[in-house]
Amino acid sequence: MAAINIVKKRTKPFKRHQSDLFKRVGESWRKPRGIDSCVRRRFRGTISMPKIGYGNNKKTRYCMPNGLKAFLVRNVSDVELLLMHNKTYAAEIASNVSARKRVEIVEKARALGVKVTNAGAKVRSQE
């Protein structure tokens, strides 16, 4: 089977209408509901609204550029879950894991052939 190219239909975030004009209006998206709203009525030249057409391909959704999906790992036993799925998932160590446990997780992943996306994070070299 041929590999499917990962295509993101939109990478820019959808901004809230008039968030560039007023400081009190945040940038996070809100659906316009006013009866005279130009954005809701989809006038030409206004910002675009999120809709179903911007969705990505189901087979490549949530994929990283290397083609793997991230799986959050909090302990060594979570790495063992990826043993049979190391071609589709990559381990990503959670941010609240200590440096000592990180070393154990990375060693276990290397033994099982599981890729770790943030293997070098928070791990200091022996001085």
Curated annotation (Swiss-Prot):
Domain of life: Eukaryota
Function of the protein: Component of the ribosome, a large ribonucleoprotein complex responsible for the synthesis of proteins in the cell. The small ribosomal subunit (SSU) binds messenger RNAs (mRNAs) and translates the encoded message by selecting cognate aminoacyl-transfer RNA (tRNA) molecules. The large subunit (LSU) contains the ribosomal catalytic site termed the peptidyl transferase center (PTC), which catalyzes the formation of peptide bonds, thereby polymerizing the amino acids delivered by tRNAs into a polypeptide chain.
Annotated signal sequence range: none
Annotated compartments: Cytoplasm; Nucleus, Nucleolus
GO molecular function: structural constituent of ribosome
GO-annotated cellular components: cytosol; cytosolic large ribosomal subunit; nucleolus; preribosome
GO terms (BP aspect): cytoplasmic translation
A Pfam family annotated for this UniProt entry: Ribosomal_L32e
Keywords: Cytoplasm, Nucleus, Ribonucleoprotein, Ribosomal protein
Encoding gene (name): rpl3201
Protein name, entry field: Large ribosomal subunit protein eL32B
Additional observations: There are 2 genes for eL32 in S.pombe.
